[in-house]
């Protein structure tokens, strides 16, 4: 759905949803832009179709303009990034690049080379179902145990209460009944120290409930997913410097901020391919309020071309 620019203090999406400046203050920046929106019933998919479009448009430009001098260029697309499996089978050596950039950011000018350290946690509870009329001192309600564990985690460390460099525990799923129940979390923090502390805290909470209900009732499975790329990118300041130059040449003001999430670039950086992240112009990812600025997409494409020229020199 292509809509005209924001008018006044709100924008309607197919008469189904309304975005207001009060709820989405960053909309003010996009006054005068042409915005691509959802139809109001599902997500847009700008994360990361916007990046794909920008990369391919830049490639098309280079094919049509052989006078643009550049070095060897490698382009890659990874599936399953959103579930943390995007580079499971990515062959960095075969790819043959020294440095790379993901085009997977959002707001115009975003330049990101810090991301969360990330882990997943699964809690499985084996309850004991007894007729509720005769359950005193016998029943173990697995659903209640799952809820009890969640209540042991700091409420202030939930996504809806955190920003900037603040990490969180995010409860993403609860399933079950009295006899069996499970819950799933993602754990995030930019600081490796605080990240490890969060995992230990969850282990301690699980141990506390094991002491209360007995062995075999509750099981915790923790799995690290990816780590903050900063320590792998900072030794190569030229990668960041050239991104600054490319943006400024495109008329974009660089905004360095931590990613409150992750990219495949984080894992690629640990695989020996330093890979910071560039903006796309997409906003409000993963939901019905998602939109993308066509104007910013054009600047993202120009930033890519500028990077190619700068590295070519």
Q: What do these predicted regions represent?
A:
Residues 143-313:
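Metal-dependent amide/peptide-bond hydrolase catalytic core
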Residues 42-53, 136-144, 291-298:
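Short, conserved micro-motifs enriched in small and acidic residues
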Residues 29-42, 126-130, 250, 282-286:
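Glycine/charged-rich beta-loop-alpha catalytic/anionic-binding loops adjacent to active sites
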Residues 100-135, 139-145:
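Phosphate/diphosphate-binding glycine-rich loops and adjacent basic-rich segments that engage nucleotide
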Residues 78, 104, 124-128, 188-190, ...:
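Solvent-exposed residues in well-ordered beta-strands and their adjoining turns
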Residues 29-116, 156-158, 162-172, 176, ...:
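Acidic/histidine-rich catalytic neighborhood of metal-dependent amide-processing enzymes
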Residues 14-34, 112-124, 276:
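Acidic-glycine-rich active-site phosphate/pyrophosphate-binding loop
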Residues 1-8, 12-13:
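Single conserved hydrophobic/aromatic residue that forms the stacking wall/gate
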